[in-house]
Amino acid sequence: MRPRPEGRGLRAGVALSPALLLLLLLPPPPTLLGRLWAAGTPSPSAPGARQDGALGAGRVKRGWVWNQFFVVEEYTGTEPLYVGKIHSDSDEGDGAIKYTISGEGAGTIFLIDELTGDIHAMERLDREQKTFYTLRAQARDRATNRLLEPESEFIIKVQDINDSEPRFLHGPYIGSVAELSPTGTSVMQVMASDADDPTYGSSARLVYSVLDGEHHFTVDPKTGVIRTAVPDLDRESQERYEVVIQATDMAGQLGGLSGSTTVTIVVTDVNDNPPRFPQKMYQFSIQESAPIGTAVGRVKAEDSDVGENTDMTYHLKDESSSGGDVFKVTTDSDTQEAIIVVQKRLDFESQPVHTVILEALNKFVDPRFADLGTFRDQAIVRVAVTDVDEPPEFRPPSGLLEVQEDAQVGSLVGVVTARDPDAANRPVRYAIDRESDLDQIFDIDADTGAIVTGKGLDRETAGWHNITVLAMEADNHAQLSRASLRIRILDVNDNPPELATPYEAAVCEDAKPGQLIQTISVVDRDEPQGGHRFYFRLVPEAPSNPHFSLLDIQDNTAAVHTQHVGFNRQEQDVFFLPILVVDSGPPTLSSTGTLTIRICGCDSSGTIQSCNTTAFVMAASLSPGALIALLVCVLILVVLVLLILTLRRHHKSHLSSDEDEDMRDNVIKYNDEGGGEQDTEAYDMSALRSLYDFGELKGGDGGGSAGGGAGGGSGGGAGSPPQAHLPSERHSLPQGPPSPEPDFSVFRDFISRKVALADGDLSVPPYDAFQTYAFEGADSPAASLSSLHSGSSGSEQDFAYLSSWGPRFRPLAALYAGHRGDDEAQAS
């Protein structure tokens, strides 16, 4: 290589395109120029530019000198775009140095000429995708591939041009504004963005404008805020507006790019419209028999507003003479309709037509729009009442009548009146509902409605009568109405007064004069209007009583006192004092009652000790409750007794059935040779089912045996005691609990042994059956009367031994003795 003159350094050439040259001729921004100059001026601290102290301050060592490269985006030429040139000051131009680059886009986007160091852009660049590329440059010896200069980093910046139009990124836009809003009311804000470099030129400076809808809305050029342009937006006229907003870059200058968006603006409702009835008069009809609560009809006022601004209420103003309470109106919350309802009975005859004024008004009124007028409207509603065939009407519908209880049958009680309310005014017929007058105490004239007595009356039995009177049309009995009548029976003095109770009093023998014995009161079933007043005196037949006196206390009671000192009950122990009671009438009635006074023996303190032979019983009475309680107790006792008897009978029948079922298991052992007093005793079933402790049977055990006779066993001689030679069978029964199952083997063994003994006994007659028995308890002194062991003739028998058996066998002995005498007489 040729020696390089000192003071030379790395140079980098930049090929400027016409557009870039134009930009450089313009005054560049101070920051960019400073950056370029700083990059183009070697610095002691920059890579590849260091200062050598041996050569002095003005001597610089060989190295890289390079500028920042620029390339314009969106190049449309057919040839590669020249970017710039890198060069080492050691390059002599002989091709010994090879230039290479590495980094972003090296070899693809950017290519370098190895000999000259020229860099070209091979692709179309877009600054909006990538604003700069960072690469590294190397200078190598072509022969040895040795680095001649340290590797240096440089940047290729993509120069922006206005190639991106503004874009609205947040659409679609929907805004709203209330109707009748003032001019300049903010609706919403729209914003666009531009991908161009905002720091270079005016490519990203945007301005906003209205392309469509400028008559109603405006937009701020800088902020994009949309506002109303007029104060009279009316939702009822137009509810939705489509406004086109445009954004232009280059600050709106000629040649700038633009983008647009459509903004939907909805006009919201306010309550600026009053309700309006579609017509000024409505007509309805309803039958006069319609019950209260029946809907007459529906009316709806229209409101151009929406939502809650259409909520309304209705009121009725009645202009008819019937007043304002015949109908009422309610509002259907779902349909906002007025429902006219009947709230009083209708009557075609009294008023066939009703005219009311229906008023509708908004429920919510906005005071901002009060100057627009009253938010209410009115309409006339006419309701025609149609006639129906109605039943007669009682006037009055109920009443009270009075009659004396001594009124004769057929006496007039009162008159009821009913009339047909219809225009035809048909005749009315009357009757009494017999369900309310089962005893037919009253009758009524079918034509006049006059009520008379049908039977005799008694106030004391029934003081009031409630009857139902029927009225019906003469030619249509289905049209029927009812009226309730209360008939009060007026009292007359027809019952004499009576003593309140059968009075009995007791007085001591040593009573003093003037001693109070009894206070008398009276009852009277009558109820005079002025109240009761009773008078007491002794009967005229005995006006003066030497023993007792009667004092009228003037309060409907009287007192009985003693007249003298002491009584002798031995002479007279009971006094009967007749008392006359008279009422005040009219007419005055009286009755006589008797006060029974008993003379009794008393102690020193006046306590009664005895009242002769007749017991003194104080008058007492039981209340209905006490009587009922007493009857209930008696019934309970009767039921308990019947229940006990039923249970006992059921228990007996149960035992009887059990005995019948077990009859086949009974073994009855008896002795019929005596007087018979022990024959009815049988063993208990539980004992028979238990195991007998028979022990070892001996040859002489088992008693006598006989075949087919009434009793078995050997008979003794005529004069010997009965069965003296027979050993008795006595077996003890086990005392433990009975065996759950009967052991029949014991009985088989016992019977088998008895049969074997009978077979071996030559004295036993040849019968197929035999009986065996044993004794239990005390022996009977009576011997056997069986003829099994007797002689061949009755004459050979001697019954003299019967007389030795005791007094119980004397009739039997006399019987056999007489029989013997007859036999002897026949024999002689």
Swiss-Prot record:
Subcellular location: Cell membrane
Main location: membrane
Membrane topology: Single-pass type I membrane protein
Boundaries of every Cadherin domain copy: 64-168, 169-277, 278-394, 395-498, 499-616
Keywords: Calcium, Cell adhesion, Cell membrane, Glycoprotein, Membrane, Metal-binding, Repeat, Signal, Transmembrane, Transmembrane helix
PROSITE patterns with a match to the protein in the record: CADHERIN_1 (PS00232), CADHERIN_2 (PS50268)
UniProt comment concerning the protein's domains: Three calcium ions are usually bound at the interface of each cadherin domain and rigidify the connections, imparting a strong curvature to the full-length ectodomain.
Name the UniProt record assigns to this protein: Cadherin-22
